[in-house]
Amino acid sequence: MLEESKALFLELYKEKKKNEWLDAWTDEVMSLVQQQYSNYKLDGILQEAARHDLLPVIENYITRGGNLHIVVLDECGEKVNILNVAAANNSVTVINYLLDNNIFNVDQRVSENSRTALHSAVKENAMESTKFLLKKEQILILNLNINISDLKVK
């Protein structure tokens, strides 16, 4: 499952970046990207798929019996889940899939003292994710350790 997930990730990542970078995406750049991700384990590939909103990688993993309830480390070294990663990076397509398919619930945490997806979105100033998560579920704002006055949700 790892090699298949890596191949799908690289294919989709290449297409996404080609559209963003247009002519800057060369064979040399693709070779560097493949090198970068070649040593990744499955949890790293899934984390990157969530970060880059590459839903087909997540879907493929799930349909093959994979379990997304893995713990990964974010950029600060804190333990988070795939929903946190997606939320912190405005990967709304992945967030919607994970919530609509009841893979995660909106206030799920890795541990009692860890962050929810909304915490991660707000911490990273990921406004699309923040708005989406606030609209998706009724969340008790009083339980959050954030300054609500900083949010400008329409």
Curated annotation (Swiss-Prot):
Alphabetized SUPFAM superfamilies for the sequence: Ankyrin repeat
Gene3D superfamilies according to UniProt: Ankyrin repeat-containing domain (1.25.40.20)
InterPro entries reported in the protein's UniProt record: Ankyrin_rpt (IPR002110), Ankyrin_rpt-contain_sf (IPR036770)
Pfam families in alphabetical order: Ank_2
Ranges: ANK repeats: 78-108, 113-142
Protein origin, superkingdom: Bacteria
Alphabetical keyword list: ANK repeat, Repeat
Protein's name according to its UniProt entry: Putative ankyrin repeat protein RBE_1220
Organism of provenance: Rickettsia bellii (strain RML369-C)
